[in-house]
Amino acid sequence: WQRIVELGDAGTMHELVSGEVFKFIRGLGGSSMQEHMRGATFGISSPATLKLVMDKLDKIDLKSKDLAGDLYEYMLSKLTTSGANGQFRTPSHIIDLMVALMEPTFKDRIIDPACGTAGFLVGAAEWAKGAGQGSGKAFMTKANHERYETEMFHGFDFDATMVRIAAMHMFMHGIDEPNIAYRDSLLPLPDP
């Protein structure tokens, strides 16, 4: 990141990020992110816009996964695609209420059949990891931590872009292998 920012020249930065870095991210082998990023395109076409965004992000301490996740959530709230295809983002206070009523634990499997940006799954993950589990003590066991990262949360959406956004949202909140799949949850399940 720092080396790209230090390049200074907007054209060089854009060429490197759109050509090499994005290509690398799309090809991360052995991870679910590779599947989610298949067919993704780099959406910042202007070198000047990329430089502006990178300069602004560089001023923020993104080493904290919580801060990075919060920033990502803020950017999600500004999505212009909200309402397209009948999709609407659930307000965070509604997510918080639903999660508090549910009180998820590490014994649960949480499935969101229309996950959109994965706001509900992230809320449930944060609850299980922290506030709802005695301030994170249960999260510290190896078994709980592994279950949290690999099999506790599942989301489905019928919009490929939302699947990518949801997977990245989960990743930004510490779920290294997000179980987010492209699927219309109203259709019958395929035969096994």
Predicted regions and their residues:
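Non-catalytic, mostly N-terminal accessory regions of nucleic-acid modification and defense proteins
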Residues: W1-F106, N179-P188
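Conserved S-adenosyl-L-methionine
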Residues: A84-P192
